[in-house]
Amino acid sequence: MAVYTDITEDELAGFLAAYDVGTLTSYKGIAEGVENSNFLLHTTRGSYILTLYEKRVNADDLPFFLGLMHHLAERGLSCPLPLPRADGALLGTLSGRPAAVISFLEGMWLRKPEAQHCREVGRALASMHEAGEGFALTRANALSVGGWRPLWRNSEARADEVQDGLKEDIAAELAYLEDHWPRNLPQGVIHADLFPDNVFFLGDRLSGLIDFYFACNDFLAYDIAVCLNSWCFEKNGSYNITKGMALLSGYESVRKLTAEEVSALPLLARGSALRFFLTRLYDWLMTPAGALVVKKDPLEYLTKLRFHRAVVSSAEYGLRRDEASQ
């Protein structure tokens, strides 16, 4: 469910008067997504997305998110483009919520991605990293290594309710990652949440990237680790090296990884798995019964985390380069 704030047609028409989008002909709520209220708009000029930003999104971050999408789209990345109001602002107010009108992106997300799609994702991710260069605003990654311990404290006492021994296991993992986390890797703007439902395809062609509301500044290779975790594991928990090889080769067709990034990838993948495990664990334990949130099983990411612990080299992810030569 992704409509938390209802709007009337008169309210919407008044709001749209500040935009050069024509006259409203129809609108409907969009069911996917959990952070904001989203509506599909049809006007005499075409189709658009209206987003009302709910309380879970920090309003202070909105200039970064909207400015980044505008920056990336101007540089040729296929992503939603926030439309300016008559006064030039990208953000307005509707029903007491910050709101934006964004271009409509054709396509659908894939429920069963294959290796060819992973290659396209890798290529698009690298293109996004390059397009993000020069973006003036910055935003720290609140869900990187510095944010994991506070998140863990919220769930630690009840962790063994999910699996026996989990509290001790995750405490040790967190301590290890805090001690060994990389410090000097190439940085830039990252998406940080490029799961399959945030990538649109038309047939087998990638048509665009969406949902930049976790975007931030961090290690570029961390974004790759997020994608390895979200695109390259099968439902039975096994890692598909064919998909990993495709994703990594797609990325490197645009931007080559440094030797330091190659060496750090197993550690970054562990960290990415822990990050999504911790947020899922929190939601699993703390979401009230009856809340309009679909809880996701945290153990899926525990399985991935344990896989990464055993990885010795990035070659095990499908990176087919001589690390020593980089």
UniProtKB/Swiss-Prot annotation:
One GO biological-process annotation of the entry reads: threonine biosynthetic process
Give a yes or no for keyword Ubl conjugation in this entry: no
Pathway the protein contributes to: Amino-acid biosynthesis; L-threonine biosynthesis; L-threonine from L-aspartate: step 4/5
**InterPro entries xref list:** Aminoglycoside_PTrfase, Homoserine_kinase_II, Kinase-like_dom_sf, Pseudomonas-type_ThrB
Reaction(s) this enzyme catalyzes, per UniProt: L-homoserine + ATP = O-phospho-L-homoserine + ADP + H(+)
Keyword presence, Protein biosynthesis: no
Annotated EC: 2.7.1.39
Name the cystine pairs.
Answer: none
What the entry lists under HAMAP family is as follows: Homoser_kinase_2 (MF_00301)
Q: What family does this belong to?
A: Belongs to the pseudomonas-type ThrB family.
Protein name according to UniProt: Homoserine kinase
In its UniProt entry, the species of origin is given as: Sinorhizobium fredii (strain NBRC 101917 / NGR234)
